[in-house]
């Protein structure tokens, strides 16, 4: 028998969330971001649910190869590009597209100029200051690619730093202006908008949008919930109570007795801890569902177990179902209580946790 903790993946939710992307950007092609094992949801499971997207974006070359070998014919984009010249033969063989964001990649492309045919996304650093050519470097990089016979098609791209922050619209306007100036009057396909920009900045939709977190049912916006956006959770992490303890006043529970009972109370011990991907730093008070009713985490999260307050759920006992996040318990709410983001919780699901659909 396996432990009762599992991640239930809902392909229908992925499909519905993709439909919301299209509703917001009806004239753009969709590059579904499925990096980090599709944000913890499973690469091929997510790809099947998102098969209507015109493209997939990820980081790992081996994952891109798996997609092609599974029969997906869409554009498949490597978001960090290639790291070694030997990877270019794989990129060509599997008809992958690659981001180019620094001069060393240009040099490697130059070395195979007579031996390859590649589609390239040229990245501008418009203010994120992470990857990409500066506005000064960008025109020369573009001309370099245009002169290289190995390069078949060029798409221009950038990435927004503050699209999720409603009081930082000036930052987005500045990045958009920077991109438009660097691109000039050249007609080439363009890709700018991540999830937050898809929802907030239609002027940035361009030819390709790149939704990530919104596909998985988490909100990219700090002050708007996934439910308000119509997004549905694609992952529900559930478990069961495996033991019940009755605490007397001032009894502690778990390591360090970080929580002590103020009065007599029942505590449920749940199969699930930080080795499964639940955040160790989640404090007492972090919300959880037991038998579909809200209660709270108490005490310190341990490697394999956590503790829930059963004071108001008198009929709960060993075997009672627990929802750690997902349907009925938004991952963003749990993340906020733990001082992190829904992105991190979804991506942190441990390999030992069973995923089911």
From Swiss-Prot:
Pathway(s) annotated for this protein in UniProt: Amino-acid biosynthesis; D-alanine biosynthesis; D-alanine from L-alanine: step 1/1
Its EC number(s): 5.1.1.1
Gene3D superfamilies with a match to the protein in the record: Alanine racemase, Lyase, Ornithine Decarboxylase, Chain A, domain 1
Domain of life: Bacteria
Reactions catalysed: L-alanine = D-alanine
Ligand binding (substrate): 130, 303
Broad class of enzyme this protein falls into: isomerase
One GO BP: D-alanine biosynthetic process
UniProt cofactor(s): pyridoxal 5'-phosphate
GO terms for MF: alanine racemase activity; pyridoxal phosphate binding
Entry's Gene Ontology cellular component terms: cytosol
Enzyme active site: 35, 255
Ranges in coiled-coil conformation: none
A Pfam family of this chain: Ala_racemase_N
InterPro entries in the cross-refs: Ala_racemase, Ala_racemase/Decarboxylase_C, Ala_racemase_C, Ala_racemase_N, Ala_racemase_pyridoxalP-BS, PLP-binding_barrel
Keyword match Cell wall biogenesis/degradation: no
Residues recorded with modification N6-(pyridoxal phosphate)lysine: 35
Keywords: Isomerase, Pyridoxal phosphate
PANTHER family (alphabetical): ALANINE RACEMASE, ALANINE RACEMASE, CATABOLIC-RELATED
HAMAP family, per the entry: Ala_racemase
NCBIfam families: alr
Role of this protein: Catalyzes the interconversion of L-alanine and D-alanine. May also act on other amino acids.
Similarity remark: Belongs to the alanine racemase family.
Official protein name in the record: Alanine racemase
